[in-house]
Amino acid sequence: EFLNRRSLQTQHLYYRKAFLSENGQYFDTLDSKPFSTEFSFSRFLVPELCRQQQKDGWAMFVDGDFLFLDDIMKLFSCVNNKYSVMCIKFNWVPPQDERYKLDGMIQTRYSKKLWSSLMMFNLNHPHIKKLNRDLVNTSTGSHLHKFRWTDKESIGFLPDEWNYVDGVTSKSLKPKAIHYTKGGP
C-alpha cells in the first residue's frame, strides 16, 4: 500500500530479521520478554542501515500493519530538522483487561506506548548517529521504546491522523493512515 500512496519516487528498503541476522546487523536474540517480537528491536536499526547506504536527510520506520490512505510524501513535509525523531505522541496505556496484543504476545503497559510504531528519523541529528547496531543489540526494549537514547526535547510531534488507532485516536480525525494494532481489516 505504501508504494501506491506516494507522489514522488522514494527508495524503500524492506529487511526481514533473518537477513539482518545473516549480515551481522542484528544479533540480539528473542528472550521471551514482552517486547520480543521479530521487529521490536530491529526497527531501531533503520538509521544504521541508511548510513551504510550513505543516505542522509530523513528515514521512516512504519509497522507492517498500517494502511496508508493519503500520499506518504505529505508526512515527510511535516518533519522539522531540530528533532532527532518525530512520531505521534500517544497518551495511551492499554486497559488492564487487554492482556494480549497482535500475534498473542503479552500486552505491556509503559509510557510512550505506540510511539515507535511510526517514526521519522533525522539521520543528520547527533542523537540518531548514536543509534547504531551495537546500541540496538545491547539495549533493553524499555530503553529503545521509551526513547531513552534521545532527550525529550528532541522528540517532535507528527499529526495524529498519520497513525490512526481505533479506540485510541479521536474519532473526529480523518485518518491518513490506519494502524491495525489488533489485526488486519
Where are these regions (language model features)?
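Glycosyltransferase catalytic domains, chiefly GT-A lineage
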Residues: E1-P185
